[in-house]
Amino acid sequence: MTKDKKKKDNVRYMDVEFNVSMHCNDCERKIARVISKFKGVETFVTDMINHKVVVRGKIDPNKLLKKLKKKTGKRVKIVVKEEKGEESSKENENVLEIDMESICLGDQSMFGFCDWEMEKFMVFSDENVKAICSIS
């Protein structure tokens, strides 16, 4: 086997749950930034209250673990590894979608504000001087 085939064998589509020490919104943002830049990540959900991050995609969990430890300086542990086969249950996908919706549709998103709330204020702000208000 060549090195390319070995690398492809280790990388599979999976859901991985990490236990990450997060105590404030800045910690959560830093972790989200590192995970979003990692190659192969499709979606991720951070839960600051339970100190957990669920990552879904074609990733090598050990590489992501090392990257999170190095970039954030936090204690990180792998909690669950689930490989997705052809007969994957849709319950896990639905739970992840519900978690994503609850984070975005709640009072605040994981970054402290919702995008749709900010759009209302940005339409007629002082920074957007070319905004046109036309009342028909």
Swiss-Prot record:
Q: What top-level branch of life does the organism fall under?
A: Eukaryota
Keywords tagged on the record = Lipoprotein, Metal-binding, Methylation, Prenylation
Signal peptide per UniProt: none
- Propeptide residues, per UniProt? 134-136
The HMA domain, residue ranges: 13-77
Lipidated residue numbers (S-farnesyl cysteine): C133
- Tell me the residue numbers annotated for binding a metal cation: C24, C27
Query: A Pfam family in this protein?
Result: HMA
This entry's Gene Ontology molecular function terms read: metal ion binding
Positions modified as Cysteine methyl ester? C133
- Is Cell membrane tagged as a keyword? no
Q: Which InterPro entries match?
A: HIPP4/7/8/17/18/19, HMA_dom, HMA_dom_sf
Identify its protein family. Answer: Belongs to the HIPP family.
Q: What does this protein do?
A: Heavy-metal-binding protein.
Q: What is the name of the protein in this document?
A: Heavy metal-associated isoprenylated plant protein 19
